[in-house]
């Protein structure tokens, strides 16, 4: 497997985890750049070119609510996980735990 193929698989796995991490972090309202920093601090480094389209898609799908904050010098769009987003985050969290357990069981079988 070439290095670029390997990196592609890692990127695909990480992209899926960004959805869950974003939904969980945005239970407290936040804006895009702040979320980028939070994701990086939590071990999910993300590119702005990945995050902003994701936020728009999740909003369009009803998993995020948003509003503009114009109180500061520069208007910022704040996002918050919607009720549907909380349900999705709960389901995804359970699924990730099940996948981690299944993966650990496979690892145990190898030994």
Task: Describe every region a protein language model picked out.
Residues 48, 74-75:
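Short, aromatic/basic-enriched loop-to-helix "N-cap" motif that marks the start
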Residues 10-52:
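N-terminal helix-turn-helix DNA-binding core of bacterial DNA-binding proteins
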Residues 87-111:
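Amphipathic alpha-helical dimerization/coiled-coil segments
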Residues 51-61:
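Basic amphipathic alpha-helical segments that dock to polyanions
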Residues 75-92:
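Basic, amphipathic "hinge/linker" alpha-helix immediately C-terminal to the N-terminal HTH DNA-binding motif
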Residues 61-74, 80:
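Beta-hairpin "wing" of winged helix-turn-helix
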Residues 1-11:
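Short, Lys/Arg-enriched N-terminal segment that forms or immediately precedes the first helix
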């Amino acid at each position: 497997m070439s290095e670029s193929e390997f990196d592609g698989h890692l990127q695909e796995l990480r992209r899926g985890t960004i959805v869950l991490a974003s939904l969980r972090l945005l239970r407290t309202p936040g804006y895009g750049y702040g979320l980028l920093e939070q994701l990086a601090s939590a071990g999910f480094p993300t590119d702005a070119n990945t995050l902003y389209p994701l936020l728009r898609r999740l909003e369009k799908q009803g998993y995020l609510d948003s509003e503009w904050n114009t109180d500061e010098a520069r208007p910022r769009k704040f996002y918050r996980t919607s009720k549907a987003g909380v349900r999705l985050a709960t389901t995804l969290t359970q699924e990730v735990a099940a996948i981690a357990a299944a993966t650990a069981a496979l690892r145990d079988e190898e030994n």
